[in-house]
Amino acid sequence: MSFFLTTPTAIDLGVNIDHVATLRNARGTAYPDPVRAALAAEDAGADAITLHLREDRRHIVDADVRALRPRVKTRMNLECAVTPEMLDIACEIRPHDACLVPEKRSELTTEGGLDVVGHFDAVRAACKQLADAGVRVSLFIDPDEAQIRAAHETGAPVIELHTGRYADAHDAAEQQREFERIATGVDAGIALGLKVNAGHGLHYTNVQAIAALPGIAELNIGHAIVAHAVFVGWDNAVREMKAIMVAARVAALHGGR
């Protein structure tokens, strides 16, 4: 358990290891090993390990999930689509958390949040199936009031707000608008009694404002850490991200939001 979990400045870092697997799969080798990366990330201060088992297995594969589960020392957060196959795998593996995400085979990366409003019955059934298996459920959604309310009504105890539009904003004004949507979404989730996480597209120079939001419990970050590790090493990349997040939270608590 992280030291930061016991302090008022608590904000967790979930390190996503998907793109360690992307690098491995680019040449069809056995290295780099995502499990080794996960364990090293934990040693460097990660509070959770996130991995996305996509239907097309483009990066993480079933063997990675099965190998990691008994070895993870923090929490395993398995991202998966709302499909019978993926739900069955999640119930069998029983990660600490399962984050339900939308998925399209044609996308380069996840393009938006899960449409809980439009697929309410299926999502609610998935939440029950996972909860019955002892898995805590998170829903990856856009910072939209209707989606947040619907997520709460499914019985999911956790939401992860999609920060991709904030991260991909073309100018400062657009980024500020998206930031305000996220901040409002955090407040809405907390008001409903939900644990609120966030992630997607966050990196070393845009994470500060999001980490400063006092209601966010956890940020899930992967690609930026893998990329930075090319230059500074894996341990340093993880430690730097965690330090940036905590510093932003401390500054916000001392200076106000």
Swiss-Prot record:
Short name of one Pfam family: PdxJ
Functional pathway: Cofactor biosynthesis; pyridoxine 5'-phosphate biosynthesis; pyridoxine 5'-phosphate from D-erythrose 4-phosphate: step 5/5
Primary enzyme class: transferase
Site residues by UniProt (Transition state stabilizer): E160
EC number: 2.6.99.2
GO molecular function: pyridoxine 5'-phosphate synthase activity
Species of the source: Burkholderia pseudomallei (strain K96243)
Protein name: Pyridoxine 5'-phosphate synthase
Active site: H52, E79, H200
Function: Catalyzes the complicated ring closure reaction between the two acyclic compounds 1-deoxy-D-xylulose-5-phosphate (DXP) and 3-amino-2-oxopropyl phosphate (1-amino-acetone-3-phosphate or AAP) to form pyridoxine 5'-phosphate (PNP) and inorganic phosphate.
Database matches in InterPro entries: Aldolase_TIM (IPR013785), PyrdxlP_synth_PdxJ (IPR004569), Pyridoxine-5'_phos_synth (IPR036130)
Gene Ontology process terms (BP): pyridoxine biosynthetic process
